[in-house]
């Protein structure tokens, strides 16, 4: 069983955990907080009303340019979405490797 009580996932953890959780029927969503999409990654733009529409228990992985901004805002995200899991993408958009796969 995956530990979902962590603050950050690396890109490889995100990709592996996304696959494992989706096999269990859990939605894992990459959330763009900077209006700057990651090339080759499927993500939604941060929009609280839209995010709240996801099923309870969904996992949101928030990213910014460096990962520091979303990491520092985790308390805010978790209070806004108490029925969802909120995690920050370590290194953010800057550390994303387009060709990385697991």
Q: What kind of feature is each model-predicted range?
A:
Residues 1-39:
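Flexible, polar/low-complexity N-terminal or interdomain linker segments that lie immediately upstream
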Residues 17-21, 47-56:
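Short amphipathic alpha-helix with an adjacent loop that forms part of the alpha/beta core around
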Residues 29, 40-42, 85-87:
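Conserved beta-strand segments of alpha/beta enzyme cores
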Residues 34, 45-47, 90-92:
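Residues at the C-termini of beta-strands that transition into short coil/loop
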Residues 38-48, 57-60:
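Active-site regions of enzymes building and remodeling cell-envelope glycoconjugates
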Residues 50-98:
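Catalytic cysteine-centered active loop of the rhodanese-like fold, especially the PTP/DSP P-loop
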Residues 100-102:
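Active-site neighborhoods of enzymes that stabilize oxyanions during catalysis
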């Amino acid at each position: 069983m995956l530990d979902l009580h962590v603050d950050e996932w690396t890109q490889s953890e995100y990709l592996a955990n996304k696959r494992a959780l989706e096999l269990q029927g859990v939605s894992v969503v990459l959330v763009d907080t900077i209006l700057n999409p990651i090339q080759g990654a499927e993500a939604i733009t941060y929009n609280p009303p839209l995010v709240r529409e996801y099923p309870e228990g969904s996992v949101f992985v928030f990213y910014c340019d460096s990962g520091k901004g979303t990491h520092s805002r985790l308390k805010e995200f978790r209070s806004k979405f108490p029925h969802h899991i909120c995690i920050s993408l370590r290194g953010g958009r800057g550390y994303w490797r387009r060709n990385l796969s697991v």
